Amino acid sequence: LNNVEMILSYLVGAAAFNFSYMTMVMVRMTRRLQAMLLQDSLTGLPNRRVIEARLKQEWRRWARHTAPFTVLAVDLDHFKQVNDTHGHLAGDEMLVQVGQRLLAGVREVDTVARTGGEEFLLLLPDTDAAAARAAAERVRASVGDEPFRVRGQSLRMTASIGVAQVGEGDADAAAVLARADAALYRAKGAGRNRVCGADAAPAEGAPAGSA
């Protein structure tokens, strides 16, 4: 009988241990999956899903309290030449370093995201037009003023930036983002390595959701 009790006790203990271990493994796997869904796999920055969710949050805050926010759309100029000339590993390394420089130049409350390829988005809460323009110029300088040390080589890069501050004519968060993108294309068309502000949103009354 004692042997049976010992065996049963062992089996129960082993089952409890295995359950605890499997639970721990599942928790870790869940966290990794969540990170994969929310982070850019190359740079570790938030991805488009994250910044669009935060943009919607800021939009709701604007609609309720008229709290200003600004979006910066950033695109690296002629980045394809880096990949074509130095290889994709060099391009990837430069993207990581660009992300680090962008993070170093903003506040903790700001969001820096890589949204694909050589494109980044920055969300700056509680930022008026003058502060937004200054922030955009700092971002541009952080990319272009100093060369990048990539795989033993010194490589130059510049960035074009579109700036859009939320306005009463914006129907939703996507409208602010669209104006930032349009300003970015104007910066590209005007010669690159520059900051362009978005056209003001056409006023159509109070922001949605302000009632």
What positions do the PLM features span?
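Membrane-embedded alpha-helical segments, specifically the hydrophobic cores
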Residues: 1-28
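Short regulatory alpha-helical coupling segments
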Residues: 34-35, 48-68, 99-107, 125
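Conserved nucleotide-binding and Mg2+-coordinating catalytic segments in signaling enzymes
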Residues: 35-53, 74-88, 96
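Short helix/loop segment flanking the catalytic signature motif in cyclic-nucleotide metabolism enzymes
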Residues: 94, 121-138
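Alpha-helical scaffold within the catalytic cores of cyclic-nucleotide enzymes
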Residues: 98-100, 131-148, 179-181
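Short catalytic/binding micro-motifs of nucleotide second-messenger systems
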Residues: 104-109, 141-154, 165, 184-186
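A short pre-motif secondary-structure segment
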Residues: 112-114
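Catalytic-core segments of nucleotide cyclases and related cyclic-nucleotide turnover enzymes
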Residues: 130-133, 151, 164-211
